[in-house]
Structures are given as structure tokens and as C-alpha cells.
Amino acid sequence: PYSSLNPRMTVEDIIGEPLDVHKLYTSKGERRDKILHLMELVGLNAEHATRYAHEFSGGQRQRIGIARALATNPKFIICDEAVSALDVSIQAQVINMFEELQDKLGIAYLFIAHDLLVVHHISDRIAVMYLGRVVEIADADELNASPIHPYTQSLLSAVPYPDPKMAKERQRIILEGDVPSPLHMPTGCAFRTRCKYATEQCAKECPTLTDRGNGHQVACWNK
């Protein structure tokens, strides 16, 4: 949120820029009405319209960016690390806002993040990637309860849980070895250099996603 907004533009001009580019209004009055409506959707007050980006907190700046993204009435939005730079309390507010906007506007999200608690909270289905390849796809609850791919298992084992009993029951999986360079990918499965289940087949051929039931897909030869 700190580098995505032009410091020389007011909030009104930032949110209104997509309207200008795509000519989505017929008068200045209609333009302003649309901007104020977008601001209201993301929880910004009308008096914020004439202020500049540096006058806002990180969470408010993110709301400005989201309002701008909504200006063209999209049906699909890609959210790339949309809350990673925010404090935890602000993250929760922004995520709740995403869900409210989805209910109101029927928007679909592709939510890219490294925080699995956030991902599980907001997602219907989750795809886990390793070095640019999808290694597992499942419904959010299914993936959280029954991960199959060794990489997914290691990721979930590192997630902190507030329940001490649950945290004690979940065994921490420590991966060994170094992450391969994306410029010099290993043959076969990219994860094999860190996987305790790796075999000769893993070095020869990259596994494809196979359905394990209920839409749960995994790319692994040995799991």
C-alpha cells in the first residue's frame, strides 16, 4: 500500500483514474458520485476524497487501492499479498472487508499469500505452489485437515495455533537441504532435493496432479 498510490494525486483522482481511462461516466457529477460510492464500499469517508496518500495509515491506503480496483466493476480480482504488509489487527479488518465486498458484489478472488491462516480463512479452495508449480489443490478445510504432499505438510506444521493442545499434537516437520534456484531447476520433481520420500522416479519425471477424491489433487509419486 505504500508504493502503489501516486503521492501527487488526491484520493478522488486515484480512485477516479480507471473511470477516466475507460470513460465510465458522462459528467463530472456522475464521476464524483461513483467515486464517493466506491469510497463508502471500502469504509472511507467522503471528506477523505481531497486528501493525499501520505495522510493515511497502511490499512487506509490499502482500502484506497481496493476502491480503485473496484472502479471498473470487475468480476475477478487478483490479490497478491494484499495484507502481508499490514498489522495483524488491520489484516483482519481488510480480510473481513474483502468478504463483505464478495457478498455484496459477487466478486471472485485469486488470493495469493504466504500466511496459511489468512489463506484458510478467506479461501474456498487452496492451491499450494513450490517453485512455480502447483503441488496440491483442495478445499480449504480438507487441505488444512488432511494435507498429502510433503511440502504442504511441512508448511502446515509450522503454522502457529492458539490452542496449546492442538499445537502439541501437531508434529513440526523440518525440511532439510536448500531451495533450488528457479534458474537451474532440478530434473523431475522440483521438491525432491528436500523430500525424504524421494526416489529415482522423482528425479526422472515430474509428477502431474492426480485426483485423490473430493477434488483433492496432489502432484507426488510417493504419497
Predicted regions and their residues:
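Q-loop/switch helix immediately C-terminal to the Walker
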Residues: 7-21
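P-loop NTP-binding/switch modules centered on Walker-like glycine-rich loops
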Residues: 82, 86, 90-168
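A short, proline-enriched helix->beta-strand linker immediately N-terminal to the Walker B motif
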Residues: 71-75
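Interfacial catalytic loop of ABC nucleotide-binding domains
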Residues: 33, 50-52, 170
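Conserved ABC ATPase "signature" region
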Residues: 29-47, 153-157
